């Protein structure tokens, strides 16, 4: 079965997105479970990639242009699923007309986001016990 990318709302994609996020952020990275789900989920566009029928990657785009909650199951990393999610969310952001998109990148992942035209801004900061940097991308940058 070929990979499938799905964009949708929280009501539609919640179960699969939550499973991936809790596996990656709560179980692997030890982010407190209470911090993983938030009120933004209900108003974001969400993306999932399915491989062989299993949801393996997720991310979201907030109404203000912030991309977040990018996660790929460990068993499916280095297979470009994160890139599929990012391309879909950036296409969505550009179509909506955001002048720029931004995100809080875990420091170890800065290089991944740079490939999509994001540029790091400002100092390193702590978010959920993990070092992050803000990254910005002007509309249409590649």
For each of these PLM feature ranges, what is it?
Residues 1-11, 141-142:
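Conserved N-terminal entry element of GNAT/NAT acetyltransferase domains
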Residues 21, 113, 118:
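Conserved active-site tyrosine of GNAT-family acetyltransferases
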């Amino acid at each position: 079965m070929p990979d499938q990318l799905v964009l949708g709302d929280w009501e539609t994609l919640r179960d699969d997105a939550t499973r991936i996020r809790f596996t990656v952020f709560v179980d692997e990275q030890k982010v407190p479970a209470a911090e993983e789900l938030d009120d933004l989920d209900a108003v974001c566009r969400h993306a999932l990639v399915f491989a062989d029928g299993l949801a393996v990657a997720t991310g979201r785009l907030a109404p203000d242009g912030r991309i977040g909650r990018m996660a790929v199951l460990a068993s499916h990393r280095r297979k470009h699923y994160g890139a599929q999610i990012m391309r879909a969310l950036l296409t969505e952001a550009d179509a909506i007309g955001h002048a720029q998109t931004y995100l809080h990148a875990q420091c170890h992942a800065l290089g991944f986001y740079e490939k999509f035209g994001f540029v790091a801004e400002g100092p390193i900061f702590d978010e959920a016990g993990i070092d992050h940097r803000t990254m910005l991308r002007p509309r249409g940058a590649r």
